[in-house]
Curated annotation (Swiss-Prot):
This virus has been isolated from a low active healthy carrier of HBV, negative for HBeAg. A genomic mutation in 1896 creates a stop codon at position 28 of HBeAg, without affecting capsid open reading frame. The HBeAg negative variants of HBV are associated with fulminant hepatitis, but can also be found in patients with persistent infection and chronic hepatitis. The lineage of its organism: Viruses, Riboviria, Pararnavirae, Artverviricota, Revtraviricetes. One of its GO terms (molecular function) is structural molecule activity. It comes from Hepatitis B virus genotype B2 (isolate Vietnam/9873/1997) (HBV-B). This is Truncated HBeAg protein. Pfam families: Hep_core_N. The gene is C.
């Protein structure tokens, strides 16, 4: 849950392909 929240924050702060890949990697 916390990782997902961090992912959302990162995506909002820096919406880039790299951020998306990191998010998918965490999920």
């Amino acid at each position: 849950m916390q990782l997902f929240h961090l992912c959302l924050i990162i995506s909002c702060s820096c919406p880039t392909v790299q951020a998306s890949k990191l998010c998918l990697g965490w999920l």
